[in-house]
Every structure is written in structure tokens, then in C-alpha cells.
Swiss-Prot record:
Name this protein carries in UniProt: Bifunctional protein FolD
Family matches, as InterPro entries: Aminoacid_DH-like_N_sf, NAD(P)-bd_dom_sf, THF_DH/CycHdrlase, THF_DH/CycHdrlase_cat_dom, THF_DH/CycHdrlase_CS, THF_DH/CycHdrlase_NAD-bd_dom
Cited HAMAP family: THF_DHG_CYH
Species, as recorded: Rickettsia peacockii (strain Rustic)
Binding site for NADP(+): 166-168, 191, 232
Keywords: Amino-acid biosynthesis, Histidine biosynthesis, Hydrolase, Methionine biosynthesis, Multifunctional enzyme, NADP, One-carbon metabolism, Oxidoreductase, Purine biosynthesis
CDD domains given in the database record: NAD_bind_m-THF_DH_Cyclohyd (cd01080)
Pfam families: THF_DHG_CYH, THF_DHG_CYH_C
One CC-aspect GO term: cytosol
Length: 288
């Protein structure tokens, strides 16, 4: 049944376009896009994610610098390091790999990244732009990836009933803002929602981002559902599964993203797209 949304293929299309765009941009300037990745500690999953980001960045001509810091670093010391990157004109974008150790104040760290280099879209100013409907700043990459995957198969979203399971600042909240802009009717559910199945089963589109392995079975959907699984649940060193019971759900819905190979590659593609945007913005700033 060919109803799988191939996030890897979609991401490769985006990356191919970005590579050409970078070649064009760098042919007219001595500068190149450069991404700084701040990794605190040695979380195995974070190391894998960072490695994938670096690999894809290099493929399309984005330079990277990895700042690997001890898990015992203090919040203020980490802010000082971020400020150095903010002031470095060669750095186009900055990401702080999450999660951070519990001893670090995450909100202070995310607010320390310059909004003009905040390619994750987590700075309060960028969050405010998105939820105010202002076309400025950066939007979280996973939310952008979800929207692009949906629109590939459902270009006109006006009037669609969308249920997002998850209310995080990374997926649920920013994606809801993007979908409202597309004239969808959006319902956000979460772990405390009652009668979840009765809500999701009526939806045109369901986005699962709750971090609960295989929680959503076929009964949660209808035959016309588009299912976007954002869950990444690591059950061993080399195996991840989603929030949706893919094997039993695939044949019961219209379209579905797999895990892996779904939203993960799309997230990286849009992270790099945001990096190129930051690079272009910096070139414009230098010219004015």
C-alpha cells in the first residue's frame, strides 16, 4: 500500500535546492553559511542527532562548528559561550542541542541566543512573531517539516479539522499557529485530555507528538486520516519507534509518516533552510 509519506525523499528535494542556492550565494561573496552547534554533556541520542545535522550540512555546503561542553557547566558560563557565538560574524546560525542537563536553566539559555541566529525558533521574540502572525524571524523546524509533509499530499488545508496531540514549544504550539494561518480548525490535545480517541477519530489530520511508544492504534483514526507521527521513542541503541502503531495503522488511513524516515529528515532539512535564511539576512545586513 503506497500511502507512506516519504520524509527522506521530501527532505532530499529541499536539500538539493538549498545546495544550489548556497552555490549561487557564495559565488558572489567571500562569506559562507556557518552553523554553530552547542552540545552540553554526552547524551547518546543527542550525539546521534548532532552527527546527522553536521553530515547533512556538509553535503550542501554549510560549514559547522561543534562546541562540546561538560554537563557540569553552569548556566552563566554557557550563556557567556553563546554570547561569543552571537558576536562572531562568521556564524550564521546557532542551535543549542536539547535536552540540557537539569541543572541548567533552559529558558535562560534559549533566550541568550541572538534572535537573528536562532534558527531553532525558540527565542521568545521569534515565538512572539509566529503567534502574532508576523512574517519575521524563525519558526521551529519540526513544525515547518510537519506542515510541508502535510501540504505535499493535501495542498489546500482550508477548513480541515486537525488534531495535534502534544503541546510543546517545539511541535504542538508552533504547528498550531502555522495551521491556523492555513485556515484549519485546530484542536490541541495532551496527556490529560479525556476521550482522546473520540476526538482524533473525527479528524482529517492527526499529528502525534506525545512521546508515548505505539500509543495510537487504528481505532484512533478514520480511513481518510492523514497521520503525522513526530514521536521518537528509542527502545534500543539502534531502534526507534513512533507514537503511532505504524504496522497496524498504515492500511487503515489515507497517508502516514514512518519512523524513522518521516518527520526526522524534514526537521533537519528545515533547520538547514533556516540556516541559509540567517546567512542571507546577514549578507543583507552587511550590505546596508
Amino acid at each position: 500500500m503506497n500511502n507512506i509519506i516519504d520524509g527522506k525523499a521530501l527532505a532530499n528535494e529541499i536539500l538539493a535546492d538549498l545546495k544550489l542556492e548556497i552555490q549561487e550565494l557564495t559565488s558572489h561573496t567571500n562569506a559562507s553559511p556557518k552553523l554553530a552547534i552547542v552540545l552540553v554533556g554526552d547524551n547518546p541520542a543527542s550525539i546521534i542527532y548532532v552527527r546527522n545535522k553536521i553530515k547533512n550540512a556538509h553535503k550542501i555546503g554549510i560549514y559547522t562548528v561543534l562546541i562540546n561542553l561538560s554537563a557540569t557547566i553552569h548556566t552563566n558560563d554557557l550563556i557567556s559561550k553563546i554570547n561569543e557565538l552571537n558576536l562572531d560574524n562568521e556564524i550564521s546560525g546557532i542551535i543549542v542541542q536539547l535536552p540540557l542537563p537539569s541543572s541548567i536553566d533552559k529558558n535562560k539559555i534559549l533566550s541568550a541566543v541572538s534572535p537573528s541566529k536562532d534558527i531553532d525558533g525558540f527565542h521568545p521574540l521569534n515565538v512572539g512573531y509566529l503567534h502574532s502572525g508576523i512574517s519575521q524571524g524563525f519558526i521551529p523546524c519540526t513544525a515547518l517539516g510537519c506542515l510541508a509533509a502535510i501540504k505535499k499530499y493535501e495542498p489546500n488545508l482550508t477548513g480541515k479539522n486537525v488534531v495535534i496531540i502534544g503541546r510543546s514549544n517545539i511541535v504542538g504550539k508552533p504547528l498550531s499557529a502555522l495551521l491556523l494561518k492555513e485556515n484549519c480548525s485546530v484542536t490541541i490535545c495532551h496527556s490529560k485530555t479525556h476521550n482522546l480517541r473520540s476526538i482524533t477519530s473525527k479528524a482529517d489530520i492527526v499529528v502525534a507528538a506525545i512521546g508515548s511508544p505505539l500509543k495510537l492504534t487504528a481505532e484512533y483514526f478514520n480511513p481518510e486520516s492523514i497521520v503525522i507521527d513526530v514521536g521518537i521513542n528509542r527502545i534500543s541503541s539502534n531502534k526507534i519507534i513512533g507514537d503511532v502503531d505504524f504496522e497496524n495503522v498504515q492500511s487503515k488511513v489515507q497517508y502516514i509518516t514512518p519512523i524513522p524516515g518521516g518527520i526526522g529528515p524534514m526537521t533537519i532539512a528545515f533547520l538547514l533552510k533556516n540556516t541559509v535564511k540567517a546567512f542571507k539576512d546577514s549578507l543583507y545586513t552587511l550590505d546596508t
